[in-house]
Every structure is written in C-alpha cells, then in structure tokens.
Amino acid sequence: MARIEHAEIFMVPLDPKVRRVDAIQSFVCQETIILRLHDADGATGTGYSYTIGTGGSSVVALLVDHLLPRLLGSDGDGIEAIWRDLYFFTHATGVGAITSLALAAIDTALWDLRAGRVGLPLHKIAGGAKSRVPVYTTEGGWLHLPQEALVDDAHRAKADGFHGVKIKIGKAHVSEDVARVGALRRAVGTDFELMVDCNQAFSVDDAIRRAHALDAFDLGWIEEPLPADDLGGHIRLAQSTAIPVAVGESLYSIGHFREYLQQRACAIVQVDCARIGGITPWLKVAHMAEAFNIDVAPHFLMELHVSLDDITTSRLTIKDGYAEAPQSPGLGIDWDWQAIARLSLITQSVRKAA
C-alpha cells in the first residue's frame, strides 16, 4: 500500500487554436490546472482540469489550502473512498464549478497513478467497453463564421472521415440559423450527422420556436438550448420537439443528472469529466444514463482537447472517422514537462507534513 506523499501543481494558460465565438461569449484562454501526485514507492500520476479563462487561481487555492493537505498520506488505490471523502469535505462550499474542477484534478491523477502501476490504459481499467469511438468536429462551426466557411469545413470533415459536424446557432433572427443549417444539410447530404449548439442562449419559447424551424433538417441533437438550471423548461422543450435534446456540460453534480434523467428532460447526456469532478463521478453518470437507455456524448473529453498540443508530445490517433483509445498505461498523455514549466503562471508544491 503506497501512500501519496507529494503533489506538484501548475496552471498553464493556453490560447485557443482558432477564434471561438458562440451565442453568449468569445473564448480567449483555457486555464489548465495540472496536478502531479507522487507516492511513497516513487510512482506518479498526473491529472488535470480546466477553466475557460476565469477562476483557475481559485481552483489552485482550493487544492493547495484544503484538498491536498487532506489527501496526502492516503492510499492512492482508494480512489472511490478519496473522492467521497473530499466531496463531502467540500460540500459546505457548495456543489459547483470551483469545487468540481479541483476534485477532477485529483481524481484523474489517481486514475492515472493506478493505471500506470498496473500497466494498463485508462479505458481498460475503467471497463474496456470500447477501443474506439466515432468522432465529429466542431472547429469549423463557430457563430462568427460565414455560411460559406461552414459549408467548406463540412465538406472537408466528411472527406476526412468524420461522422458529423456541430455548429453554433443563436443568430439574431431564426431565419439566419435556418439558412445556415439548411445550407449544411444540402451540402453534406442525408448520410452525415448535423448537430447544433445553443450554449444556453434561449428562452423556452424561443428554443421551441427554433427547434420547430429546424425540424426538417434531421438534426442529431440540439445542445444546451436553455440555461442548465431550467429543468422545467427542458421538460417542455423535450416534449415539444422530435430533435433529441442534449445537456450536461454545465451540470456539476450526479444529482443534477439524476433529475434530468428521471424527468426525461434530455435525450443525450454530455457529462464533462472536469466539471462533474473527475472520472469517478463521470462513470457514475454514464452508468446512470445507461439505466435510462440514454446515450452519452462526452463534453470536452479531457485527454482529447487540441489546446493540450502545446504541453504534450502525444497525439490522439484518428482513423476512418474513429478516435482510437490510447494503449499506453495511464491516461495515454505524454506531458512535456519542460513546456509546462516554461508556460506555467502558477507553480506550487505540497508535501505531507512530517
């Protein structure tokens, strides 16, 4: 039984590779919080979390001042026990972003540590359900892009083997969204998935109106049409449209997902590994969705995000429209520690008290 003795924390700001504009904001920075745990046997595990430009230093402070002092000295194999202990330890601070993002950094590091110790890739020790998953692209679908650019990107994505594209909607007039989606459907045909993402921009009535206007285009889903805390609105929308409603990236607890699933307020669950608090609760949500016969399409899957290219040397393998699960032990990420040290705005170390 090897106990956790030492932790290193880095916060690295990463600029987006392309300009990103949706219905509510423009992305300017990804604050990446990287946590490296060392156990008494000399083994290490690295996890990470992220923010969209705000709050990264608060996540670091919660880790350094409260969570890591409680973690150090624990048996690194007790992942479930550690997650539950830290979850309830922080419960009084409220279930939400800062707490969940900090928990995720610890939890993913522990999974990486365990997988590395047994010499297996993460997807194997998490159950090994699939060795590859179909992929779609969002990078050409931002709201500021002209219609012609959306069509060109969709053509390239289809030629490259992607299974679909997702674009942002939320133009001032419904007719603009309809024109853009219609142009895409005509360009790629009916054998290619199209999804739309609203980024919580609409009222209930506006979302219902836009869903009806887009119904003819056989959409794979309409994502985050309403504010995430509007459960009743999602119930109304789900009952009024044939388009599958996707939610989850802005839900921060298992209980929130339970409510959506019990009320049949969504058809696609997009649980985010960082925002839910790590791999441990992510798996709980995925299995809960399975019990309701609801599909899972993960949001912002942590090891896939292209911005990490600046601080990693490994790359995801995509072949014939499928992302192949990494086969190396752990998360499958080769971190560039020199780049991390060079780019980090915050670097801290926490050791177990003597």
Give the role of each language-model region.
Residues R19-Q25:
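Short, P/G- and charge-enriched loop/turn segments at secondary-structure junctions
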Residues H212, D218, D229-Y322, P326-P329:
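Shared catalytic-loop signature of beta/alpha-barrel
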Residues G42, L67, I106, G119, ...:
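Conserved, mostly hydrophobic/aromatic
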Residues A2-D15, S26, L301-A354:
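Flexible C-terminal active-site loop/helix
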Residues H6, H38-R117:
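Metal- or metallocofactor-binding catalytic centers and their adjacent structured scaffolds
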Residues K124-G127, S131-S240:
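Metal-dependent enolase-superfamily TIM-barrel catalytic cores that perform enediolate-based chemistry
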Residues I33-A40, S314-I318:
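Short beta-strand elements
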